[in-house]
């Protein structure tokens, strides 16, 4: 009897676990997306701060590769940017990665083309989700109107 109850509890726990982690993953996604939008979609943030956050942008892109709609051409350009960025960071000067300077050219090229489209797609997806959440939220009629419909 005790073994059956223990097995049942394990099954229930394993059944609930995916739902709990899905909600946690979703909130992590939202938190990271908002963080990136606050940096890359904000004209008041300077390029050096944006450059420092490129690793987070790349990590987000790789963690959620299909969540942001991109054309095949934009996706290929973004992949190329990631390759160029990593190649640049692998070059060592006196045993350390470059500390700035020439990377601005790569970053400027990225922001001017695919980065802007990626961030815009990320922002537009957020706006669309906000509108659909608002549209799907249940509306409660005022009580006097509810009484009339009964």
Swiss-Prot record:
Compartments, as annotated in UniProt: Secreted
Main subcellular localisation: secreted
Residue ranges with Polar residues bias: 132-150
GO cellular component, one term: extracellular space
Region named Disordered: 127-150
InterPro entries tied to this protein: Turandot (IPR010825)
Primary role: A humoral factor that may play a role in stress tolerance.
Name of the protein: Protein Turandot X
